[in-house]
Amino acid sequence: MRKVFLAGNWKMHYTSVEAADVAKQIVDGVYNINNNVVVMVTPTFTSLCKVCRVTKGTNVLLGAQNMSYENSGARTSEIAPSMLLEFGVDYVILGHSECRTYLGENDEIINKKVLTGLKHPFKYLILCVGETLEEREKGKTLDVVLNQVRNGLASVYESDLQRIILAYEPVWAIGTGKTATKEEAQEVHKAIRLEIQSLYSKSAADNIIIQYGGSVNVDNVEGLMGENDIDGALIGGASLKADSFLKIINKISK
């Protein structure tokens, strides 16, 4: 049975003091959580130091929102994997739609980051994939998403998949208040799992974690998580307040 991974992505919100306060509330709120649920928080780079002090030694994993595929060098504004590990980072989000859109990251760059991340002792790498509204309306959803999966996992060995989490996040549902229906999400998640089976093996497909991201909240999370191939959520706005994030967590872990 696959575990449920619930990751809060705080994007460009909170000072380090504010982030640490929210993290402390979450840590306290999940002290006795069901072992089948994994809770993750992803603050800004500048908050990692303070949040690390809160999450260290707890059952809440600490993540980073991106990283360079280089380990050092002339990469102004970027951050290296080793720098993240200094702050106890457990996982890194890669290929988020906002990074693809605003930072110009393409499949080749994202694949380089995946391969670099696998050379470092992160527990997990979250590889995000998803289609735009225009691509969905043209019936290209599966073509786009599965191509991103193939490109993102290029040269990744099956033995490394235990450290890979895939996150399907339809771009049109990110921060818009819109969300895919549970049936729409399940259709894509199932296709992704079948693609993993084709690329690797049935065992790999059965075991890989596939999250859904896109305006997830306390009202829709239970329905989404009830689908066979949805193993968690990458949660934006609803994770910014500890009480709303905890409501989501408690709804799934009950």
Swiss-Prot record:
The keyword Isomerase appears for this protein: yes
Leading EC class: isomerase
Keyword entries, A-Z: Cytoplasm, Gluconeogenesis, Glycolysis, Isomerase
Highest taxon of the lineage: Bacteria
CDD domains in the record: TIM
Main localization category: cytoplasm
GO MF annotation terms: triose-phosphate isomerase activity
Gene Ontology CC: cytosol
Purpose: Involved in the gluconeogenesis. Catalyzes stereospecifically the conversion of dihydroxyacetone phosphate (DHAP) to D-glyceraldehyde-3-phosphate (G3P).
Subunit structure: Homodimer.
Family (UniProt): Belongs to the triosephosphate isomerase family.
Name of the protein in its database record: Triosephosphate isomerase
Organism listed in the record: Borrelia duttonii (strain Ly)
Lineage of the species this protein comes from: Bacteria, Pseudomonadati, Spirochaetota, Spirochaetia, Spirochaetales
